[in-house]
A protein has these predicted regions:
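Short solvent-exposed loop/turn micro-motifs enriched in small/polar/acidic residues
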Residues: 1-4
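Serine-hydrolase catalytic machinery in alpha/beta-hydrolase-like enzymes
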Residues: 8-110
Length: 110
């Protein structure tokens, strides 16, 4: 994974910052297909980043979507449940956040 780069990507949804994580092979100059990754209910974590890097090794640009907002990183099941419940109860909100991440991935150039 020496040439896999993992970087923060900040985008806005309704004026609020969200911070996804982008993984890609920085040694490649050719266009690569993109993959939008939804993390589990614990949000963006070291485990999610490792999965994204592994997929990036296969020739993809991977964006881990931030579903909770910049700086919201649950550290236990209670926090994760509290962060996920609004999205579970409002699928339109979840879709909106996923679409915003997708739009960011689609328009990212590096």
């Amino acid at each position: 994974m020496e040439s896999i780069t993992l970087q923060s990507v900040i985008y806005q949804i309704d004026g609020q910052p969200y911070e996804g994580r982008l993984a890609y092979d920085s040694s490649r100059a050719d266009p690569l297909p993109g993959l939008l990754m939804a993390p589990n209910w614990m949000g963006i974590s070291t485990g999610a980043e490792e999965i994204a890097k592994s997929v990036a090794e296969q020739g993809y640009v991977v964006l881990i979507a931030d579903l909770y907002g910049q700086g919201v990183r649950p550290s236990n099941a209670d926090e994760a449940g509290a962060a996920m419940m609004p999205l579970k109860n409002d699928r339109a909100l979840l879709r909106k956040r996923m679409w915003a991440a997708y739009d960011n991935l689609r328009t990212t150039s590096f």
